[in-house]
Amino acid sequence: MGGGDGHNDQDKGLFSNLAGGLAGGGHYPPGQYPPAAGGYPPQGYPPAGGGYPPQGYPPAGGGYPPQGYPPAGGGYPPQGYPPAGHHSGSSAPHHSGHGGVAGMVAGGRAAAAAAYGVHHMTQGHGSHGGHGGYAHGAMGMMPGMGAMAMASSSTVSTVMESLSRESTGRARSTDTRSGSNLSFSISSRTFWATK
């Protein structure tokens, strides 16, 4: 490499021995810059005709809105609208009586069915019966599903408790098993949901 004094003045960089012949002498840009013909902007630009806006714009007729708009007849709504005989009232159907109670009872039945199903899932009464071949902690479901089902039953029981108070007024709490339970009656059936 060079001399013995420890200074290396021969290295030019990685692969510098290969790039020397490719760049044509190693100077950039090649040739003269800027070109001798001229600078910026190129010849012929901007057009000799003028600037902005181009000739003939905007039209000589006027601005906005175009002539003939809006129609001379009037504003909004157009004449003849709404059609004769149109009733302008609420579009929602009108029901009198106790229609809301039927919807509440139907909703309560659906919620009770959901609680009933969750209760059976958490107590090991799945489709295979008993424990379904899994360990006791899985409660008849796939391994690891017991905690999720228990959390769901807790949520369902809270909802069911409020529904039962509103619809029947016969909710009661008992502590007969390891957890607290909720029972209530809808349509002469008693459902249990584990909290």
From Swiss-Prot:
Residues 47-77 have a biased composition (Gly residues). Residues 163-175 have a biased composition (Basic and acidic residues). Residues 82-94 have a biased composition (Low complexity). Residues 23-103, 159-182 are annotated as: Disordered. This is Glycine-rich protein A3. It comes from Daucus carota (Wild carrot).
